[in-house]
UniProtKB/Swiss-Prot annotation:
Cited CDD domains: P-type_ATPase_H (cd02076)
Gene name for this UniProt entry: PMA4
Record's function text: The plasma membrane ATPase of plants and fungi is a hydrogen ion pump. The proton gradient it generates drives the active transport of nutrients by H(+)-symport. The resulting external acidification and/or internal alkinization may mediate growth responses.
Transmembrane stretches, start-end: 65-84, 97-117, 247-267, 278-299, 647-668, 674-696, 713-733, 755-775, 788-808, 818-838
First-tier enzyme category under EC: translocase
UniProt note on tissues of expression: Expressed at high levels in root, stem, leaf and flower.
Catalytic reaction annotation: ATP + H2O + H(+)(in) = ADP + phosphate + 2 H(+)(out)
Chain ranges on the Cytoplasmic side, renumbered to this chain: 1-64, 118-246, 300-646, 697-712, 776-787, 839-952
Molecular function per GO: ATP binding; ATP hydrolysis activity; metal ion binding; P-type proton-exporting transporter activity
Active site: residue positions: 332
Localization annotation: Cell membrane
Gene Ontology biological process terms in this record: proton export across plasma membrane
InterPro entries associated with the record: ATPase_P-typ_cation-transptr_N, ATPase_P-typ_cyto_dom_N, ATPase_P-typ_P_site, ATPase_P-typ_TM_dom_sf, ATPase_P-typ_transduc_dom_A_sf, HAD-like_sf, HAD_sf, P-type_ATPase_IIIA
Protein name: Plasma membrane ATPase 4
Length: 952
């Protein structure tokens, strides 16, 4: 007998619980197969600690200082050093006011970043707590689902298909498990674990179900020890690369401006040393978008919180930008497009065995089901009985074989009242037919019934039985007999059809990926209005392709298909891979352990509600509510978040260009030295205003969106260049002419550099901040209502700027108030030259889209002799495309959507077709039948479904 040791010694690992016999494990851990009591579990938790890895607590001070350690902050810090080190010349003291101002700007920016990120981090931690792994544990003699963190050595847990093992444990009696240990050992194939073997925390159960006794938790597990040996890797994501590219563009623009100033001011113009340094400081301070990392990270954090409120928890923050760009969604049918609430029509049950009625077929199916911890099919089978207890009435359960994706069936070995042994099995018809080694006539009859069911959108479930004369659960038993076929109806969700229509309008192509038969997939697709261009999974391997699509390569077939049927997990992975090769941003939904590779491969892996731990672990977004509508809502929210970030980046690039080139030309042409301190005031007011962009109301992009750096830089350069030019023109009119004095009766500022400084400051401040209203809107800026917070922040900032320009009298900043008359003139000037900004924005977008060149070179629109610019051809192409997409006509070898035809043109044709259909509908209203059908169509009801399932 093993020497008894204390729990403290077990914690210190003085005994090797992995190698000793299982009975000694119970003895050493002072526990039984009945599990621990709740009190004992709580006391052991004090000894062993929670079952999770130690979290590194980052210093708050270091985290705060970290916000000052990035390339954009380095430039500002270099400017601060310049203000006191290099600006100490020409008999003037160091530029302390600019130094203090720069430090204040950095501290303000870091404080806002720290507070917002801390709040977002707390919110994210609360959300992720909801995703904390759960496990089935035996406490006080009852099985219950608990958080894995409460597990202690000695607990009895249940491990089933799809579970991530929550702690190191030894397996108890039962069938062997298949365990995927690739995350720990790198083994690519699942390993077989027999009773008595150890399973490691972090590995995944791929097949089987078994109980186990916990022997190590938290940092004492194999996974916990390994985690201490490796440092976390810092992968640079796409979002970080975009930030770096935009930051580098701004820094390079500033560097070019500074280089030009240095070359012109010192060797050519022979300016004073200190004047040159002051001008360089203006470009450095004003050009750097110091708030960019803060604004973008806060925007993403707030957006992530909003997504969680809609039922989508983001595990990876940058998944938001990928969700905004998603253009293909591969969706499961069961549970996502349908309710996953199955029912059986007793009248359609088909009996194959002699001396058996339909009720016995249902009873046998219920016996081959779980009575607890059920999935949807088990619950349906047991629920069809008058009393669920009948499933185990008069029999004694010997062994239950749970469902696994390979065998696709469940089975129960049981003993009846006469002490005879039997085995019942239910599962996929093909697997059950092979199990029974059915004759050809039986197979033909089964396939015929399956086709009839499928035409009505019904899935098939087969039932078989056999006797076990050897009276042993390991014995093969007698020959399997095919007993019957059951039709399962899984009704579509009430909102699926409308959601799919919304998805198509948003430019997201929804493809149904299902393991069901092709006929079921087509019928579901027809009911949901997503098309009937469905193909069997065999077509992905180049087999069983329809003659109409035989010439299509696999990639093109996947792209054009509305969905695939009879799909296995490896097919899902292949579908995602091929779509990505065609440059699509792909989303994939999944719920099972075998979906994990496809979820990992997809740009956005989406674990649906009630997904297994393995699917959640592989996904980027976890849904807390069922259905497709949650995903589409998340797409819209993601696009709104992305739009805010994109709006800000265009604004940041524009401001850099306008500050750098505006002040550079003024400094070089007129040798006028703008005050670096006043640029600091502009930067501080700008940052305060721009922080509100993270909560701005925006109109999401109507199509999938992504980081188009070419568009961001082009728009920023053009808008910023225009603003710089308007500032230069304003300064010329104020400095060299009496235009404003003559036209508006204000005093001339030509002889007062200090008053000109105030006027120039106000003009730059107004037009710089007003630009955000242009970059935030897709159409005319005055038609899209901004968020109230942004409007209030803008008004406060510009009120402060106007008061400074009117009343300030700061000798250190060379500023003197210019009066209310000039303030009014500057506001009028800014408003007049603000108006063309929208037109320029539209022009840039139009040129970059390529439509301008297409119209000019390809369509020759300006010189065409066709009436209505070839409208008839476009309508014909649209009609052909629609007929093909909905299975009414096979596709031709030629490209259906000629690339010359823009999305907008096709949309216009679609709108015209809708209007004609609406007119026809209104004419139908004159008949009673037409009125009833029209109302039904308007409410989105399916008349055929109503007729099938409801009778009077």
């Amino acid at each position: 007998m093993a020497k008894a040791i204390s729990l403290e010694e077990i914690k210190n690992e003085t005994v090797d619980l992995e190698k000793i016999p299982i009975e000694e494990v119970f003895e050493q851990l002072k526990c039984t197969r009945e599990g621990l009591s709740a009190d004992e579990g709580a006391s052991r938790l004090q000894i062993f600690g929670p079952n999770k890895l130690e979290e590194k607590n980052e210093s708050k001070i270091l985290k705060f200082l970290g916000f000052m350690w990035n390339p954009l902050s380095w430039v500002m810090e270099a400017a601060a050093v310049m203000a006191i080190a290099l600006a100490n010349g020409d008999g003037k003291p160091p530029d302390w006011q600019d130094f203090i101002g720069i430090i204040c700007l950095l501290v303000i920016n870091s404080t806002i970043s720290f507070i917002e990120e801390n709040n977002a981090g707390n919110a994210a931690a609360a959300l992720m707590a909801g995703l904390a792994p759960k496990t089935k544990v035996l406490r006080d003699g009852r099985w219950s689902e608990q958080e894995a963190a409460i597990l202690v050595p000695g607990d009895i847990i249940s491990v089933k298909l799809g579970d991530i093992i929550p702690a190191d444990a030894r397996l108890l009696e039962g069938d062997p498990l298949k365990i995927d240990q690739s995350a720990l050992t790198g083994e690519s194939l699942p390993v077989t674990k027999n009773p008595g073997d150890e399973v490691f925390s972090g590995s995944t159960c791929k097949q089987g179900e078994l109980e186990a006794v916990v022997i190590a938790t938290g940092v004492h597990t194999f996974f916990g020890k390994a985690a201490h040996l490796v440092d976390s890797t810092n992968n640079v994501g796409h979002f970080q690369k975009v930030l770096t590219a935009i930051g580098n563009f701004c820094i390079c623009s500033i560097a070019i401006g500074m280089l030009v100033e240095i070359i012109v001011m010192y060797p050519i113009q022979h300016r004073k040393y200190r004047d040159g340094i002051d001008n360089l400081l203006v470009l450095l301070i004003g050009g750097i978008p110091i708030a960019m990392p803060t604004v973008l990270s806060v925007t993403m954090a707030i957006g992530s919180h909003r997504l969680s409120q809609q039922g989508a928890i983001t595990k990876r923050m940058t998944a938001i930008e990928e969700m905004a760009g998603m253009d293909v969604l591969c969706s499961d049918k069961t549970g996502t497009l349908t309710l996953n609430k199955l029912s059986v029509d007793r009248n359609l049950v088909e009996v194959f065995a002699k001396g058996v009625d339909k009720e016995y077929v249902l009873l046998l199916a219920a016996r081959a089901s779980r009575v607890e911890n059920q999935d949807a099919i088990d619950a349906c089978m047991v629920g069809m009985l008058a009393d669920p207890k009948e499933a185990r009435a008069g029999i004694r359960e010997v062994h239950f074989l749970p469902f696994n994706p390979v065998d696709k069936r469940t089975a129960l070995t049981y003993i009846d009242n006469n002490n005879n042994w039997h085995r019942a099995s239910k599962g996929a018809p093909e697997q059950i037919l092979d199990l029974c080694n059915a004759k050809e006539d039986v197979r033909r009859k089964v396939h015929s019934m399956m086709d009839k069911y499928a035409e009505r959108g019904l899935r098939s479930l087969a039932v078989a039985r056999r006797t076990v004369p050897e009276k042993s659960k390991e014995s093969p038993g007698g020959r399997w007999e095919f007993v019957g076929l059951l039709p399962l109806f899984d009704p579509p969700r009430h909102d699926s059809a409308e959601t799919i229509r919304r998805a198509l309008n948003l430019g997201v192509n929804v493809k149904m990926i299902t393991g069901d038969q092709l006929a079921i997939a087509k019928e579901t697709g027809r009911r949901l209005g997503m098309g009937t261009n469905m193909y069997p999974s065999a077509s992905l391997l180049g087999q069983d392709k329809d003659s109409a699509i035989a010439s299509l390569p696999i990639e093109e077939l996947i792209e054009k298909a509305d969905g695939f049927a009879g799909v296995f997990p490896e097919h899902k992975y292949e579908i995602v891979k091929k779509l990505q090769e065609r440059k699509h941003i792909v989303g994939m939904t999944g719920d099972g352990v075998n979906d994990a590779p496809a979820l990992k491969k997809a740009d956005i892996g989406i674990a649906v509600a009630d997904a297994t731990d393995a699917a959640r672990g592989a996904s980027d977004i976890v849904l807390t509510e069922p259905g497709l509508s949650v995903i589409i809502s998340a797409v819209l929210t993601s696009r709104a978040i992305f739009q805010r970030m994109k709006n800000y980046t265009i604004y940041a690039v524009s401001i850099t260009i306008r500050i750098v080139f505006g002040f550079m030309f003024i400094a070089l042409i007129w040798k006028y030295d703008f005050s670096a301190f006043m640029v600091l005031i502009i930067a501080i007011l700008n940052d305060g205003t721009i922080m509100t962009i993270s909560k701005d109301r925006v109109k999401p992009s109507p199509m999938p969106d992504s980081w188009k750096l070419k568009e961001i830089f082009a728009t920023g350069v053009v808008l910023g260049g225009y603003q710089a030019l308007m500032t230069v023109v304003f300064f010329w009119a104020m400095h060299d002419t009496d235009f404003f004095s003559d036209k508006f009766g204000v005093k001339s500022l030509r002889n007062s550099d200090e008053e000109m400084m105030s006027a120039l400051y106000l003009q730059v401040s107004i037009i710089s901040q007003a630009l955000i209203f242009v970059t935030r809107s897709r159409s005319w800026s005055f038609l899209e209502r901004p968020g109230m917070l942004l409007v209030i922040a803008f008004m406060i900032a510009q009120l402060v700027a106007t008061l400074i320009a009117v009343y300030a009298n700061w000798a250190f900043a060379r500023v003197k108030g210019c009066g209310w008359g000039w303030a009014g003139v500057i506001w009028l000037y800014s408003i007049i030259f603000y108006l063309p900004l929208d037109i320029m924005k539209f022009a840039i977008r139009y040129i970059l889209s390529g439509k301008a060149w297409n119209n000019l070179l390809d369509n020759k629109t300006a010189f065409t002799t066709k009436k209505d610019y070839g409208k008839e051809e476009r309508e014909a192409q649209w009609a052909l495309a629609q007929r093909t997409l909905h299975g009414l006509q096979p596709p031709e070898a030629t490209n259906l959507f000629n690339e010359k035809n823009s999305y907008r043109e096709l949309s216009e044709i679609a709108e015209q077709a809708k209007r004609r259909a609406e007119m026809a509908r209104l004419r139908e209203l004159h008949t009673l039948k037409g009125h009833v059908e029209s109302v039904v169509k308007l409410k989105g009801l399916d008349i055929e479904t109503i007729q099938q399932h409801y009778t009077v």
